[in-house]
Amino acid sequence: MPREFSREKRAHSDSTTTSKRKYHEGSEDSQPAKKKKVHPPKHEHNYPSVNELKKRIRDVKRLLNRVDLPADARIVQERALAGYEKDLEDELARRHRSQMIKKYHFVRFLDRKAASKDLKRLLRREQEISNSDLDPAAKKEKLAALAGKIHAAQVNHNYTIYYPLTQKYVALYAEQKKKKKESSAQSEKPSEPEAEVASKLIYDTTGERPPMWRVVEKCMEDGTLDLLREGKLDGSEKGEKSSQAPEQKKSKKSTDDDQYARNKSSTEKVSDKPSGKSRKSGGKQDRKPKRSAAMEGAYWSANEHDDDDIESDGGFFEA
């Protein structure tokens, strides 16, 4: 009886009381555990290794220098060589582009900030003049004078954005820091209107505009600023495309022909030259008769002396 009573009591207590680990009010265990967010791995570009590409190019060239290489295998290796060289060229260009972007990023940022500030100021000045109560003739004259300055400011702004990324950046506002002292010294003089001061500051800091400034202006008219930024234009003042489709095909074909001719000439040179073993054997054959002739002369001279000695010995014993 006591055992049965204890079992019933234990079962009753288990049914009425809850576990200590389950949902106590005011405790931290009452909240379910939060699941950790699993972030997907970032997609990393697997760019080819430059050293690996160079090694493959050396191996293929070494294989093409063999004289006994079959024709079909030679064609396959020449195509592989052209592909490896193209991959190497693209990878080097990509690395150069990335390096130039990192190098001139801050300078371009400062120039873009200054150019956008000046452009906004000139546009604000133009709006003020157009909304002012001036004579139509005077208003037209001022707007015409301000239009050239706005155009120069727009070219400056596009210059800082669409300058070719793969070329050395020439700053427009490089002389601004040098002229801070001069401007502070001349600040006591009566100042001109804000727009005129800003436009003169742009012209002074620009100085002799770099050649790319005219290219940017031409590309603004043609609508090819994106191509200029990516380096797909030749960078001349005309702004024409440097890599057109037919010219690319012709140049590529000519380079392939030159490469094939170079490989063919190198193989012919290798075939004309004797191998290492033949050169060594030929050298030995050429040197061997010279050595034998010298030794024969020494041998015969030694034999003559020996004959004289024998004759003298014979005469001595005879005596």
From Swiss-Prot:
**Which segments carry the region annotation Disordered?**
1-52, 181-204, 230-319
Which keywords does this chain's UniProt record carry? Coiled coil, Nucleus, rRNA processing
Give one Pfam family, short name only. Answer: Efg1
First-listed, main subcellular location of the protein, grouped into a coarse class: nucleus
In this chain, composition skew of type Basic and acidic residues spans: 1-13, 230-275
- In the UniProt record, does the keyword Oxidoreductase occur? no
Coiled coil where?
Answer: 49-131
What the entry lists under InterPro entries is as follows: Efg1, EFG1_rRNA-proc
GO biological process terms on file: maturation of SSU-rRNA from tricistronic rRNA transcript (SSU-rRNA, 5.8S rRNA, LSU-rRNA)
What is the official name of this protein in its record? rRNA-processing protein efg1
Q: Which gene encodes it?
A: efg1
